[in-house]
Structure formats: structure tokens, C-alpha cells
């Protein structure tokens, strides 16, 4: 998790051809990109670095799905190395705010802020695939400037660290002391280890 907003562009399809799907209806054919079609099934993808533009899209999709049906689950699929703290926290707050349960799935990796978001899904509905990798650690700071300003930002990032660790303890069931210790450095967990830790509830080897 980082406080800096200087990142390479995430979640960008400029270099990737996004598949399209033709849906045949009595009113004619409609063409959807694959992500829009999955959104109709209440599936949201969170991939790449989490920054403001990515967070805004995910928040908007969750709010839209809530307005469509406040009773049906939202499914958030995660394959992300993490990203900006404030962007991630906007997603976190929305997960807690919307009425539908939010089921989280890790495929590939959930590191840093994305691991925190994986754990923040509805209890009992947090999953990962067998070869997924999860990594937790403390926030990263990259502020530059005058000594007084650096001290101000240091105090702020320590407050953020304490808040996130308290929330992580709440969602995993681990003690705050364990969370503080394990996030002091990069802590990598396999799918089974993440389940034992309380970051996910189940490792899926096949569809439920």
C-alpha cells in the first residue's frame, strides 16, 4: 500500500484486445465487451494497480449493482499487487456500505491493499483459488520535502497503519499484536495459509 499517487497506468486495455460477446435477443443482437457482460452477472474485476481511476470504476459498479438489486450478492474478483491507500479505502468503505453481501475471490495474487480488500468481503464469502498468492505488509511512504512536512506525513502514515491493522484484525480474527508483527515486513501466504490466517474462508478447487 502506498501513499504516493505516482504510478504507471493500471487496468488499461490499450495494449490488450478485450473480447466481445454478441447477445441474441428478440429485440436484436447486442454486442458487449466481456467485462460489461460479466457485470450483468454481478461480477466485478479488480486487476492491476489500485489507483483513483480504478477505485472510482469499482465503486461506481458496486453502487450500480446495489441500485439494480440490493439483495443479490456482488462478486469481486481480485488479481492485484495493491496500490494507493486512499483509493483502496474508498473501495473498502463501499464494500461495507452497500446493502448486498460482497463476495471476494482471489485469483493470481492479492498483495498489500488488495489483500486487505480480499479480507474485507462478507464473512463466509471470501475465497481464493489454490495457487493464488496473498501478501500483507505495512503501508509504504514515499513523501519528499522539508523535514517538518516529512514529520507530519510520518505521523499520518503511522495513524493509517494503526487503523488498517485494527480493521485487518477485525476481519481476520487475529490479534492486533499478531497483525502488527506479521505486517512489519512483507508476509507471503499460500492459499491454505491465507485461509488459516482468516484472510479467506475457503480455498476453491472447483465451483461451488
From Swiss-Prot:
Subunit structure: Fourteen ClpP subunits assemble into 2 heptameric rings which stack back to back to give a disk-like structure with a central cavity, resembling the structure of eukaryotic proteasomes.
Cellular localisation: Cytoplasm
Pfam families named in the record: CLP_protease
Catalytic machinery residues: 112, 137
Key word Hydrolase present: yes
SUPFAM superfamilies cross-referenced by the UniProt entry: ClpP/crotonase
Encoding gene per record: clpP
EC assignment: 3.4.21.92
Disulfide pattern: none
GO BP, one annotated term: protein quality control for misfolded or incompletely synthesized proteins
Record protein name field: ATP-dependent Clp protease proteolytic subunit
Molecular function in Gene Ontology: ATP-dependent peptidase activity; ATPase binding; serine-type endopeptidase activity
Family indicated by similarity: Belongs to the peptidase S14 family.
Major localisation: cytoplasm
The reaction(s) this protein catalyses: Hydrolysis of proteins to small peptides in the presence of ATP and magnesium. alpha-casein is the usual test substrate. In the absence of ATP, only oligopeptides shorter than five residues are hydrolyzed (such as succinyl-Leu-Tyr-|-NHMec, and Leu-Tyr-Leu-|-Tyr-Trp, in which cleavage of the -Tyr-|-Leu- and -Tyr-|-Trp bonds also occurs)
Known function: Cleaves peptides in various proteins in a process that requires ATP hydrolysis. Has a chymotrypsin-like activity. Plays a major role in the degradation of misfolded proteins.
Keywords on record: Cytoplasm, Hydrolase, Protease, Serine protease
Enzyme kind, highest EC tier: hydrolase
A Gene Ontology cellular-component term: endopeptidase Clp complex
InterPro entries linked: ClpP (IPR001907), ClpP/crotonase-like_dom_sf (IPR029045), ClpP/TepA (IPR023562), ClpP_His_AS (IPR033135)
Amino acid at each position: 500500500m502506498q501513499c504516493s499517487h505516482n504510478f504507471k497506468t493500471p487496468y488499461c486495455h490499450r495494449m490488450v484486445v478485450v473480447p466481445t460477446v454478441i447477445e441474441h435477443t428478440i429485440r436484436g443482437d447486442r454486442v458487449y465487451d466481456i467485462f460489461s457482460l460479466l457485470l450483468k452477472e454481478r461480477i466485478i474485476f479488480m486487476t492491476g494497480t489500485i489507483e483513483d481511476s480504478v477505485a472510482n470504476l469499482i465503486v461506481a459498479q458496486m453502487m450500480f449493482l446495489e441500485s439494480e438489486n440490493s439483495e443479490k450478492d456482488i462478486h469481486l474478483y481480485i488479481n492485484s499487487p495493491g496500490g494507493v491507500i486512499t483509493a483502496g479505502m474508498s473501495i473498502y468503505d463501499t464494500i461495507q456500505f452497500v446493502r448486498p453481501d460482497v463476495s471476494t475471490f482471489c485469483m493470481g495474487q492479492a498483495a498489500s491493499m488488495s489483500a486487505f480488500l480480499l479480507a474485507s468481503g462478507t464473512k463466509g464469502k471470501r475465497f481464493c483459488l489454490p495457487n493464488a498468492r496473498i501478501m500483507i505488509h505495512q503501508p509504504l511512504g514515499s513523501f519528499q520535502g522539508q523535514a517538518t512536512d516529512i514529520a507530519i506525513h510520518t505521523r499520518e502514515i503511522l495513524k493509517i497503519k494503526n487503523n488498517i491493522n485494527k480493521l485487518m484484525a477485525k476481519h481476520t480474527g487475529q490479534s492486533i499484536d499478531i497483525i502488527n508483527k506479521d505486517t512489519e515486513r512483507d508476509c507471503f501466504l499460500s492459499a491454505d495459509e491465507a485461509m488459516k490466517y482468516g484472510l479467506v474462508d475457503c480455498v476453491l478447487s472447483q465451483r461451488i
